[in-house]
Structure formats: structure tokens, C-alpha cells
């Protein structure tokens, strides 16, 4: 019973604004984003990034909410790799013309991992 209680520790998380969407991120996990900032799209894998648009940070029972963002908060991570989404196929059938058409597109996504969340410390620089 004691081992089970140790595994169910509630860790801290942050909500960040990236690519026009809000993500709930935790250290040690990876996430996929469609619209990453353009200057980071061209960089290769294992590039370190820091995201300064932090909306909320929860650490244990303490919650800090920004308006709109927290001042001295930064989420640091690294880009794992660039990849493509599953293909979206669009088919058209024109009645009475015996013609059919299909088009497809694959959006590019970036997979990144979160290393740490900093708030009100010397490591919280938005660079």
C-alpha cells in the first residue's frame, strides 16, 4: 500500500500559449504542436527552446495565474524532431459528369519535450 502512495504524487504543471493553442505541460513529457514559431521550425533536433508565454503554473497546492502571462515564468524544453501528421484525403465526386477527384495534405508538426518549469528564480529568463 505504501508503494502505491509514492507513485501517485501530483506533480506541478504549467499552461502555456504556443502556436495559437493552450497546452497543459509537465516536465518529462513530450507534446506535438502544429504551428510552432517560425524561427524554431528551421532548427534541427535536440535544439533547446524556452517558452515565455506561461499562463498558469501549479506546484503542489500553490497556483499562480497570469494576466495574461506570468512575469518571471519560463518553460524550458528541447525539440525532439519534425514530422508530418497523418494524411488528410479529400474526395470530390461530380454528379452527372463521371469525374472524380481526390486531394490530400499533410501538415507538419514538431514534437518537443519539456525539461523544466521555472518561476521567480534566476533561471527564469525569457530568452
From Swiss-Prot:
Location of the protein in the cell: Plastid, Chloroplast
Disulfide bond annotation, renumbered to this chain: none
Look up the record and give one Gene Ontology term from the biological process aspect.
translation
Q: Which GO terms describe its cellular component?
A: chloroplast; ribonucleoprotein complex; ribosome
Q: Which superkingdom is the protein from? A: Eukaryota
Q: Name one GO molecular function term.
A: structural constituent of ribosome
Pfam annotation, one family: Ribosomal_L21p
Q: What is its main location?
A: plastid
**The keyword Kinase appears for this protein:** no
InterPro entries per UniProt: bL21-like, bL21-like_sf, Ribosomal_bL21
Keywords associated with the record:
Chloroplast, Plastid, Ribonucleoprotein, Ribosomal protein, RNA-binding, rRNA-binding
- Explain the purpose of this protein: This protein binds to 23S rRNA.
Which family does the entry's similarity section mention? Belongs to the bacterial ribosomal protein bL21 family.
Q: Kindly state the subunit structure of this protein.
A: Part of the 50S ribosomal subunit.
Protein name, as recorded: Large ribosomal subunit protein bL21c
Q: Which organism is it from?
A: Adiantum capillus-veneris
- Top-down, what is the taxonomic lineage of the species of origin? Eukaryota, Viridiplantae, Streptophyta, Embryophyta, Tracheophyta
Amino acid at each position: 500500500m505504501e508503494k502505491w502512495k509514492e507513485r501517485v504524487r501530483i506533480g506541478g504543471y504549467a499552461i502555456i500559449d504556443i502556436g495559437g493553442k493552450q497546452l497543459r505541460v509537465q516536465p518529462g513529457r513530450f507534446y506535438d504542436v502544429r504551428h510552432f514559431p517560425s524561427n524554431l521550425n528551421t532548427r534541427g533536433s535536440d535544439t533547446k527552446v524556452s517558452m515565455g508565454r506561461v499562463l498558469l503554473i501549479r506546484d503542489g497546492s500553490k497556483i499562480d495565474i497570469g494576466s495574461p502571462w506570468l512575469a518571471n515564468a519560463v518553460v524550458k524544453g528541447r525539440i525532439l524532431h519534425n514530422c508530418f501528421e497523418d494524411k488528410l484525403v479529400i474526395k470530390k465526386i461530380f454528379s452527372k459528369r463521371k469525374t472524380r477527384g481526390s486531394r490530400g495534405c499533410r501538415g507538419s508538426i514538431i514534437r518537443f519535450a519539456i525539461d523544466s518549469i521555472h518561476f521567480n528564480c534566476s533561471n527564469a529568463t525569457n530568452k
